[in-house]
């Protein structure tokens, strides 16, 4: 990612910071688990349609005090500090980098707000030698588990689409977008929602992987054409198919994203706002605008707040495919963000269901 692109991203996303945190601060004040009216509005009975809720959201944003809408006087100082924090930096001993980052996660903060090692970690993730490679078969999408120098494990997700390609259809259409993982990482850092894995773009050499790095199982899910000029990968996952293999370029390079493998254990839960993934069948939350009333006795106050925050984050990246979510030390983390940024021409408002059903 060039410096110009990063500055542009920071400039655009900074404008969203005030809106997101104003919404969160304002609406959370209405969320009280001791009340039976979660889902009711202070202005009367909750509207029974998604469009009605969206109208209420816009109305409340317009009613915010100017202090929540003005740019922070410290904006430029903070922006420059964020930029410097994520600029790749040189290092001497990669083992030291792995050791330091291993102890970063705390609750659902997967990395510190500011740390001089971050730039070194990003540099190491994109440049350290790949020692071995194998399939990472869990989940629905193709990904690889790579071992880098110093025994560091990382996940690699490949590039399926050009950056400007529009994915039509439902919000969950298409394969994972590798750049969505990268953008989610930087957006989380800007919003101080440091719940996503550290991510950076990288190219891998499929010929080198096939001939030198892959284990037997991975090699069995790779193909080489007759004259040995094209190396392809279809991997192993729920939706992986040999006829949908992805191939390297003329130099056998495949672009994608490297995701730092967060240490520790995670718990996985089905999202209360999971979709049915069927055109003719709605999920309970899509039919009942008071759906949150059924959750207030099942989920803790902090869990509901985390899921509301997640919905705002997912709306900003337009990820409507969070059918499950993970927790670390009982706090929600954002491990899979690959279905973001599919269609810039459509805003899928129902991603905000946890917000408008639980807080408005």
Regions found by a protein language model. Give the residues of each.
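Phosphate/dinucleotide-binding and metal-coordinating scaffold of catalytic cores
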Residues: 1-360
């Amino acid at each position: 990612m060039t410096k110009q692109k990063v500055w542009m991203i920071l400039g655009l996303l900074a404008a969203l910071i005030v809106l997101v945190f104003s919404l969160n601060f304002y609406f959370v004040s209405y969320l009280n688990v001791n009340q039976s009216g979660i889902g009711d509005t202070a202005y009367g009975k909750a509207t029974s349609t998604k469009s009605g809720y969206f109208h209420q959201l816009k109305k409340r944003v317009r009613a915010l005090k100017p202090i929540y809408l003005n740019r922070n006087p410290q904006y430029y100082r903070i922006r420059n500090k964020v930029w410097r924090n994520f600029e790749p930096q040189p290092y001497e001993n990669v083992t030291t980098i792995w050791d330091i980052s291993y102890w970063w996660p705390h609750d659902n903060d997967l990395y510190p707000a500011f740390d001089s090692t971050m730039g070194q970690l990003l540099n190491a993730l994109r440049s350290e030698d790949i020692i071995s490679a194998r399939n990472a078969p869990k989940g629905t999408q193709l990904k690889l588990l790579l071992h880098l120098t110093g025994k560091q494990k990382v996940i690699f997700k490949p590039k399926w689409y050009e950056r400007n390609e529009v994915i039509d259809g439902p919000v969950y259409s298409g394969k994972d977008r590798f750049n969505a993982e990268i953008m989610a990482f930087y957006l989380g850092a800007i919003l101080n929602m440091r719940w996503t894995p550290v991510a950076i773009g990288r190219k891998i050499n499929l010929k080198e992987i096939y001939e030198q790095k892959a284990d037997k199982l991975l090699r069995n899910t790779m193909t080489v054409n007759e004259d040995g000029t094209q190396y392809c990968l279809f991997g192993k996952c729920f939706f992986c198919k040999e006829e949908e293999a992805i191939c390297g370029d003329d130099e056998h390079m495949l672009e994608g994203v490297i995701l730092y493998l967060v240490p520790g254990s995670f718990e996985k839960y089905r999202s209360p706002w999971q979709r049915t993934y069927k055109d003719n069948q709605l999920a309970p939350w899509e039919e009942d605008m008071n759906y949150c009333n059924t959750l207030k006795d099942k989920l803790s106050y902090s869990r509901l707040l985390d899921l509301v925050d997640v919905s705002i984050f997912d709306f900003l990246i337009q990820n409507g495919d969070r059918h499950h979510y993970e927790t670390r030390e009982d706090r929600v983390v954002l491990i899979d963000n690959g279905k973001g940024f599919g269609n810039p021409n459509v805003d899928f408002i129902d991603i905000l269901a946890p917000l408008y059903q639980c807080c408005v």
